[in-house]
Design a protein with these regions (language model features):
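Active-site anion-handling motifs in enzyme catalytic cores
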Residues: 1-308
Length: 308
């Protein structure tokens, strides 16, 4: 029997990464794993949620020494757009596992962008020594192939879930997150389209990670209210299963976060994506979702595509 350590963006109450952890833990349990340990920013909560071992993010060394396999992923761990320090951390976990002779599996990640030369060199070396590499999109596979690294192309882990397809008429979901270039002008233009198209429907504003999403969701609710739309609800404190349930109930979703759009696709909900990150653009291209840019001033064509 095999022992596993999982390295990911776990314990931050981010819906997408917690949903991935949920899928991954279930897969490892189904394989008959002897021991599963998640590296987490909130080990106590992680252990409670998943029923497995958990260690703090800066105290993973002993867990790696005792394990057989390190699983890195999923999500977008290996990129330096968020920060170079973040890339170094996740690579550091991989390098520790390699140093102690452990197998390393890269699990369905979106790789890049990695803009720094040092970051590219360190990532190439780490992945060339991994036992198995799988990625969640074609462009990540092409990047790794250009580095001489074989990578298996698989769906994002959320696509493995059997999600309900209720698609109730009359409910529109809007999922926003804070972002430096998400400004008042964009929110007002978005609100104008929603008022124009969906004034007869219930609007649900979905906060996936309250520390990042909630303030902008509440701000957008106020903007909609000023424009005369009062059938608006802000949903916060959502668990992974809450999100699956809420999105599957929707008729339409306007989604900013990558995994909001993934869940909509999997649940058969018509979605319009907001492009704040290259991973969202890749997903929209792959699944033919209408896509609006944060600098865009007219969304009528994209809303026509959503409704049509």
């Amino acid at each position: 029997m095999t022992k596993y350590v999982v390295s990911g963006y776990i314990g931050f109450d981010n819906f997408g990464d917690e949903a991935i952890a949920h899928v991954l833990v279930d897969k490892l349990k189904a394989k008959g794993a002897e021991k599963i340990t998640l590296i987490s920013s909130n080990p106590e909560k992680t252990t409670s949620l998943y029923g497995v071992n958990s260690v703090p993010m800066l105290k993973f060394l002993e867990a790696i020494k005792e394990t057989d396999v390190l699983v890195s992923g999923g999500g977008s761990l290996l990129q330096d757009v968020t920060s170079f320090k973040s890339l170094l951390y996740y690579l550091g976990v991989i390098y520790c596992a390699l140093f102690f002779g452990k197998k390393v599996e890269i699990f369905r990640q979106g790789i890049g962008p990695i803009n720094s030369k040092v970051g590219q060199i360190l990532t190439k070396f780490a992945l060339k020594h991994a036992s198995r590499v799988s990625v969640r999109d074609k462009k990540s596979q092409e990047l790794l192939n250009s580095w001489g690294i074989e990578a298996e192309l698989l769906n994002d882990p959320i696509f493995d879930l059997d999600l309900p397809k209720k698609n109730k008429k009359g409910v529109v979901g809007v999922q926003l997150r804070n972002y430096p270039t998400l400004n008042e002008a964009f929110l007002n233009t978005l609100a104008d389209e929603i008022v124009k198209r969906f004034s007869d429907k219930k609007i649900q504003l979905l906060s996936f990670q309250d520390s990042i999403d909630l303030a902008v969701c509440e701000k957008f609710a106020r903007i909609l209210s000023k424009k005369g739309l009062n059938n608006v609800e802000v949903l916060k404190g959502l668990s992974v299963n809450d999100v699956f349930e809420k999105i599957s109930d929707l008729e339409f979703l306007i989604g900013m976060r990558f995994h909001a759009n993934v869940v909509a696709i999997k649940s058969g909900v018509k979605a319009l994506a907001i492009n704040y990150d290259i991973k969202v653009k890749k997903l929209a291209e792959e699944y033919d979702l209408p896509l609006v840019e944060l600098k865009q001033k007219d969304f009528s064509k994209e809303f026509d595509a959503l409704i049509g």
